[in-house]
């Protein structure tokens, strides 16, 4: 449920209905709240990616985190330790080609545009990165730890079996009917090499 500082109409809602819990019960009884459930699932996925990739940095103390993040941890993971454990488990799961293959199959079904060779690779536009299942976002996130900023990248290719990610940049990708490849960087996750 959203907290007081998470939406502008909180006081108006409180005056007319009473509480966010009561408002949610009314919505649940009278409307389809599927969009709320989808948003909650997306937020949990975002947090999972955050905690998995956060293992590469110094771990922040729970007490130093913003209140909104503390609330989300309580809602989606119950405890900070559980959030860290799920993040760690998700990070380690990217070592399995089977996990990556299943996630690529799932991603190819939901991405607006992609090329998927089931035995070998999934290629997609960088702007669709946030639409990927969490395990693939973590996979690409690990590669970007070695590669750097993805700002100049147009296409990303996930190599399913070999533990590699390719980042490709093109001249005039968005406007040219046949853009020229200007950069292709292949990150070998298993060797931690670019």
What are the roles of these predicted feature ranges?
Residues 1-194:
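Basic, alpha-helical nucleic-acid-binding regions used in initiation and control of genome expression
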């Amino acid at each position: 449920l959203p907290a007081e500082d998470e939406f502008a109409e909180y006081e108006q809602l409180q005056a007319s209905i009473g509480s966010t819990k009561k408002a949610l019960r009314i919505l649940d009884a009278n409307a389809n709240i599927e969009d709320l459930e989808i948003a909650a699932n997306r937020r949990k996925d975002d947090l999972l990616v955050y905690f998995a990739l956060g293992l590469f940095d110094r771990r922040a103390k729970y007490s130093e985190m913003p209140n909104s993040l503390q609330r989300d941890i309580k809602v989606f993971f119950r405890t900070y330790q559980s959030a860290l454990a799920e993040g760690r488990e998700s990070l380690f799961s990217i070592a399995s080609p089977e996990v990556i293959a299943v996630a690529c199959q799932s991603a190819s079904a939901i991405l607006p545009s992609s090329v998927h060779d089931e035995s070998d690779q999934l290629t997609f536009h960088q702007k669709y990165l946030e639409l990927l299942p969490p395990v693939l976002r973590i996979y690409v996130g690990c590669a970007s730890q070695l590669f750097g900023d993805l700002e100049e990248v147009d296409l990303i290719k996930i190599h399913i079996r070999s533990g590699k990610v390719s980042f490709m940049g093109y001249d005039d990708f968005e406007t040219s009917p046949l853009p020229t490849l200007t950069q292709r960087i292949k990150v070998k996750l298993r060797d931690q090499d670019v």
